Amino acid sequence: KGESKSILVIGSGPAGLEATRCLSKRGYEVTLAEKNPFIGGRVTKERLLPGLSAWGRVVDYREGQINKLKNVNIYLESEITKKDILEFDFEHICFATGSIWKRDGVGRVNLHPLEIDSSMNVYTPDDVMGDIKIDGKVVIFDDDHYYMGSVLAEKLVKEGNEVIFVTPASIVSEWSLNTLDQPFIQKRLIELGVQIICNKSISKVESDRVDLLCKYTGNISSLETKNILFVTSRQPIDGLYKSFSEDEIRMHKDIKSIDIIGDANAPAPIAWATYAGYNYAFNLDKKVDEDSLPFKREITDIIN
């Protein structure tokens, strides 16, 4: 433990929970504030998707560890404001407020928002994981290339929707090649009857159709639909963090640092967000040498 005593962690997703767990283990007094009536952030919703129930252990383990500790106070349904933060006497403020999925089509292929007709029903993974029910045919545009597009396709098929899966990659869930899951994912979608369209991106969204752009020929084709689900990229929820100026922090003598971690800093996989929480807690009150590695490499010799 360092010289500080109290830390406020805002957000209880993977990053916030891991930061809370590690900080409390080090001996700090930690207050964890969560705006929802439950902890877990994105994992609480994603664990309910087809095939992802085991991911809930990310939350279950940390919740179990935190509940054993007396130096952690958890406040649910507590949406913290800037005024609240300045009125309390926390020495360190850690924002782990997560991210939301974009609904403008911006991702790896489309670097600018698409032209979208206002009468088209536009959805994001946050909508599908919430209480929104989609009727009829759904076009999923997957420019995320990991697991989310495919599990949402499976969820929608099981709910009775006709699903067309569009991706600019040559295969479904291309990034999943790195985890050896890709062949199983594509096989699963084919068996479910999902129509797969590869090597095409969405260039425009009309009131009753989407225009597809072939990445090789540049030819335009159209798909009739009233529902488009964008699985493209995520936007950090960092408005409260950015509302603090350096002058305000300097004027408030009790605040030693304000940091932002996890998806709120840069949206990434759950494992990275969890590590971000650990890294923040591990280095608090320490002088970090930015020019050196935070670990020692094992150099092996080859013996003939």
Positions of PLM-derived features:
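N-terminal Rossmann-like dinucleotide/flavin-binding domain of flavoprotein oxidoreductases
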Residues: G41-E91, W175-S201, R209
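Rossmann-like dinucleotide/flavin-binding elements
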Residues: K1-K35, I39, I74-L86, A96-P113, ...
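SH3/SH3-like beta-barrel fold
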Residues: V210-C214
